[in-house]
């Protein structure tokens, strides 16, 4: 099968990590152009050393690039605000956009949960790094029982957070919380991000707390174990940090402020899941699991899109 050409907009940490993945591990897609706005950026310099065409004049420079017509998929790893502008500029050209910012113009996609549901959408959103790590766990619990409330805490090394991530903290929490509900299946969702300043940096760690009623503990454990294996198939450094924990909290009134006062039955239990994500160190060191899970998930979507396009052509 011939490969599908792609472009990456954004030459920061996420964009550069994605470019290296496209060079080293992609099967059905190939990088044609890396787009940035700073001619001196490390990402553009690395791409040039790899023999990849670069543009330092933003999305307009991409549109004017001689290979633009051959490009079918465009990753945007800039910022939520920039993606709004980029998507508008690219809309007339019918390209598939994979949005790695919290802009969320299009539907949320978490490959382990709903990869096949939105492949026809012109612009799909990869939620956030914290969402990619934790929403599969919320969805795994939701398969077994109703999740009345889910809260996630994503702790990432400060050194792995570039200016785009730092500019999008509010969007991170809002987008992740919505996706916990829409993709994860929780009735109510909340997200918190922590930029850990520890030096040497620690790998990404994520906590998922879910409120459920009368849980089948063995079934929930098995569902979570199965989901971790599904995610680890494309993010090898993704794993449970310790055993899933169950804590009885009492009556529904004890958590009414979190569940909107809904009648959720008693007793209410808290399910606690602790994860860590070790990066593949394609660009930043292994502590940057937040980059790895985001770019690996986006690559999964691109590979699936390329497969679907090839099948359509073959018919």
Curated annotation (Swiss-Prot):
Keywords assigned by UniProt, alphabetized: Aromatic hydrocarbons catabolism, NAD, Oxidoreductase
EC number: 1.2.1.10
Species the sequence originates in: Rhodococcus jostii (strain RHA1)
Statement: the UniProt record of this protein carries the keyword Glycoprotein: no
Active site residues according to the UniProt entry: 129 (acyl-thioester intermediate)
Binding annotation for NAD(+): 11-14, 160-168, 290
A single GO molecular function term of this UniProt record: acetaldehyde dehydrogenase (acetylating) activity
Pfam families assigned: AcetDehyd-dimer, Semialdhyde_dh
GO BP of this protein: catabolic process
InterPro entries, A to Z: Acetaldehyde_dehydrogenase, Acetylaldehyde_DH_C, NAD(P)-bd_dom_sf, Semialdehyde_DH_NAD-bd
Catalytic function, reaction form: acetaldehyde + NAD(+) + CoA = acetyl-CoA + NADH + H(+)
Lineage of origin: Bacteria, Bacillati, Actinomycetota, Actinomycetes, Mycobacteriales
Entry keyword annotation includes NAD: yes
Similarity field: Belongs to the acetaldehyde dehydrogenase family.
Domain of life: Bacteria
Protein name: Acetaldehyde dehydrogenase 1
């Amino acid at each position: 099968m011939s490969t599908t050409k792609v472009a990456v907009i954004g030459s920061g940490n996420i964009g550069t990590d994605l470019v290296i993945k496209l060079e080293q591990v992609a099967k059905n897609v190939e990088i044609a152009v890396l787009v940035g706005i700073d001619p001196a950026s490390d990402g553009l310099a690395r791409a040039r050393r790899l023999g990849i065409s670069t543009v330092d004049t933003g999305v307009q420079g991409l549109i004017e690039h001689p290979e633009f017509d051959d490009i079918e998929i465009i990753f945007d790893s800039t910022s939520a605000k920039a993606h709004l502008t980029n998507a508008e500029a690219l809309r007339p050209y019918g390209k598939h956009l994979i949005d790695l910012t919290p802009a969320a113009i299009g539907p949320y996609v978490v490959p382990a949960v709903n990869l096949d549901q939105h492949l026809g959408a012109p612009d799909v959103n990869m939620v956030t790094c914290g969402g990619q790590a934790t929403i599969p766990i919320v969805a795994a619990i939701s398969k077994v029982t109703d999740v009345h409330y889910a809260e996630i805490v994503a702790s990432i090394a400060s050194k792995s957070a570039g200016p785009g991530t730092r500019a999008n903290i509010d969007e991170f929490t809002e987008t992740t919380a919505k996706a916990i509900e829409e993709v994860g299946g929780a009735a109510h969702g909340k997200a918190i991000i922590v930029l850990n300043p520890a030096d040497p940096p620690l790998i990404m760690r994520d906590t998922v707390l879910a409120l459920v009623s009368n849980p089948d503990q063995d079934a929930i454990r098995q569902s979570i174990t199965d989901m971790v294996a599904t995610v680890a198939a494309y993010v090898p450094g993704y794993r449970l940090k310790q055993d899933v924990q169950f804590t009885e909290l009492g009556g529904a009134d004890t958590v009414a402020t979190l569940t909107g006062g809904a009648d959720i039955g008693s007793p209410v239990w808290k399910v606690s899941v602790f994860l860590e994500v070790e990066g593949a160190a394609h660009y930043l060191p292994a502590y940057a699991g937040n980059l790895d899970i985001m770019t690996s998930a986006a690559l999964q979507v691109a590979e699936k899109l390329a497969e679907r396009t090839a099948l359509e052509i073959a018919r």
